[in-house]
Swiss-Prot record:
This is Pheromone-processing carboxypeptidase KEX1. Residues 544-641 are cytoplasmic. The gene is KEX1. Glycans are attached at residues 207, 440, 448, 500. The active site is at 188, 389, 451. It is a single-pass type I membrane protein. SUPFAM superfamilies: alpha/beta-Hydrolases.
Length: 641
């Protein structure tokens, strides 16, 4: 009897143990997945106020860049609507320091604009037509990003290090984008950020081991609008620009006051200030112009001199879309849709004063000193300016280009004494500006544009982007924009009215479909193996028991086995049949795409000055109240986007 009892209980005991082990394995596996996020955790399934039509493919959320200090950067990524000849990703940064890139996402180059604080409309001329767009709130503490209160960063090299860490982790989440052509774009104080990040990426690529060559990042270009890049020339341009635009008149008391401030600025620059990003005396030149133009309680808008604003805001209430963005980004349903972490304990702010006041960059040299090396490394740079911006005006940009030396020449010098001509640009029959270029550097002046060029001229800015990216729709289809340089069309670019698909896009879809099935097959292998092992063990003991107990009434000994219906395994079969499968066609094991994306036409592997608007430290203050402004050097009366 003892022997029979042993044989009859052993299969049941082992089956019970196996079932418990599988249950524990499933729970532990789920907990591991919960701790380490994957792409589907960032997928934006719906967006409050979205316009009619299919939702654009986007992801959003936080990536940790400083574990010790709980530093996390927030991103919002939009997948391109169409694919040209190859995959491209543009990373957009606003300035400050401390101003959110959601300005760029919702007021400039993103696919949506806010009609009011609860309604989104499509942005004609958005930059996501043929490029993936990645908006990042940085440094830590900016916008939706966060960090422990006492751990804000201070220098540009710290910022660049954090950003490289962000990209390392972001590409782990989204490996299908790691081999895209990579471009950085931004405005204002991003003129400091972007060259530092570019230098850090170039250094990273140089230091990458032979074994890791496949993880080289394909940095292809920089695009900076109204950037704060070279304080020496740009500070001195305030007086010149004020006279040129007739903001002050020579010989008047107002002009004399500005000239005195200008002289004090020159003295500080000559006393060791030329290698600093911030010169306190020079900030007073801009302040003086704003003060002397005050009339009936209003002053010029420092971001668009054609407009006036309440003094001392002088542009901080502009652009008008600002009044919609803050309430929209503080809505609970929007916060949830964008996967904003609970650790972000304060509401979204356009510009964060604590970030600005801590980011003094005292030991950082102006980014203009990095540009020659970047250009000489083969990275093209386009600088563009809105002609009506005062705070980072085009005269200052043109002056530092004229003085800068790189690749054996000075400025736009083609040969000694011969300068590159300015090429007139017309867009749809209107004078749009001009282009000038030499030795990998291009300069574009936008006529009648403000500090935020894409806000004023979205379609023209997209035309500039497509030219810079090398998008040519000749073999794609669609209606080309009537854009001409010196009367010649050149490469055809498309702004709106795009085709439903492109040849490259069809190829990409076929690859994605194949990769999707491959990924599902791969993900199913583990479950199949587990089920096969369980079935084999179960079958073995049933077979052995029957041999030992032939005719002993198997059902009577194990009555509960009949209760293990197919429904008991439904959890394994349906593990992926959750809402995460909404994006099954894209957020599978993305590493399957590493050998698929962009292999047709390119090689793999290697090869605001301050804020628009300002900071609101009081969560309960009215959204329309005056906000603290930010100049590239934290000047109390100016700002930058």
């Amino acid at each position: 009897m003892r022997s029979t009892s042993t044989f009859t209980r052993t299969p049941a005991f082992l089956l019970h143990t196996l079932a418990r082990w599988l249950l524990v394995w499933g729970v532990l596996g789920s907990s591991v997945v919960a701790e380490k996020k994957c792409a589907s955790n960032y997928y934006v399934r719906s967006l409050p106020g979205q316009p009619d039509g299919p939702l654009l493919k986007m992801h959003a959320g936080h990536v940790e860049v400083d574990h010790k200090n709980n530093g996390n950067l927030f991103f919002w990524h939009f997948q391109n609507r169409h694919i040209a000849n190859r995959q491209r990703t543009v990373i957009w940064l606003n300035g400050g320091p401390g101003c959110s890139s959601m300005d760029g996402a919702l007021m400039e180059i993103g696919p949506y604009r806010l009609k009011d604080d609860h309604t989104l409309i499509y942005n004609e001329g958005s930059w996501d037509e043929f490029a993936n767009i990645l908006f990042v709130d940085q440094p830590v503490g900016t916008g939706f990003s966060y960090v422990n209160t006492n751990s804000y960063i201070h220098e540009l090299d710290e910022m660049a290090s954090h950003f490289v860490t962000f990209l390392e982790k972001w590409f782990e989440l989204f490996p299908e984008y790691e081999h895209d052509d990579l471009y950085f774009a931004g405005e204002s104080y991003a003129g400091q950020y972007i060259p530092y990040i570019a230098k850090a990426i170039l250094d990273r690529n140089k230091n990458t081991t032979t074994q890791a060559q496949s993880r080289l990042w394909n940095l292809k270009g920089l695009l900076i609008g109204n950037g704060w890049i070279s304080p020496v020339e740009q500070y001195q341009a305030y007086l010149t620009y004020a006279y040129k635009e007739n903001l002050i008149q020579s010989g008047t008391d107002a002009a004399k006051r500005v000239e005195r401030a200008h002289s004090e600025c020159i003295s500080e620059l000559d006393s060791g200030g030329k290698d600093r990003i911030h010169a306190g005396a020079c900030e007073k030149v801009l302040s003086a112009v704003l003060e002397v133009t005050r009339e009936n309680g209003k002053c010029i808008n420092m971001y668009d001199i054609r407009l006036r604003d309440e003094f001392p805001s002088c542009g901080m209430n502009w652009p008008p879309d600002l009044k919609h963005i803050t309430p929209y980004l503080r809505r609970d349903d929007v916060i949830s849709a964008l996967h904003v972490n609970d650790d972000k304990r304060t509401g979204w702010r356009e510009c964060t004063g604590a970030v600005s006041s801590n980011f003094n960059a005292r030991n950082s040299k102006p980014s203009v000193q990095l540009l020659p090396e970047i250009l000489e490394s083969g990275i093209p740079i386009t600088l563009f300016s809105g002609a009506k911006d005062f705070i980072c005006n085009h005269i200052g940009t043109e002056q530092f280009i004229h003085n800068m030396q790189w690749s054996g020449g000075t400025g736009f010098e083609l040969s000694p004494g011969v300068w590159a001509p300015r090429h007139d640009w017309t867009f749809e029959g209107e004078a749009a500006g001009y282009y000038q270029e030499a030795r990998n550097l291009t300069y574009v002046l936008f006529y009648n544009a403000s500090h935020m060029v894409p806000f004023d001229f979205g379609r023209r800015s997209r035309d500039m982007l497509d030219r810079f990216l090398g998008v040519d729709i000749t073999s794609i289809g669609g209606n080309p924009a009537d854009s001409r340089i010196d009367g010649e069309k050149g490469a055809l670019t498309s702004v709106g009215n795009h085709p439903n698909s492109t040849t490259a896009e069809q190829r990409e879809k076929e690859k994605l479909k194949a990769a999707t099935w491959a990924a599902y097959y791969k993900s199913g292998e583990v479950a199949l193996v587990v089920v096969a092992i369980a079935a084999a063990v179960w079958g073995f003991f049933i077979w052995r028991s029957r041999r030992q107990r032939q005719g002993s009434g198997y059902r009577g000994i194990y009555p509960n086995l009949n209760g293990l219906s197919s429904g008991s395994f439904s959890g394994f079969r349906n593990k992926r049949s959750s809402h995460d499968d909404i994006e099954a066609a894209a957020d599978f094991d993305a590493s399957e795409l590493d050998t698929l994306r962009g292999t047709d036409d390119r090689s793999r592997g290697a090869n605001g000055h301050g804020s628009v608007g300002g900071d609101s430290e009081d969560e309960d203050e009215k959204f329309g109240a005056q906000k603290e402004s930010y100049h590239p050097s934290n000047m109390p009366s100016s700002s930058s986007s």
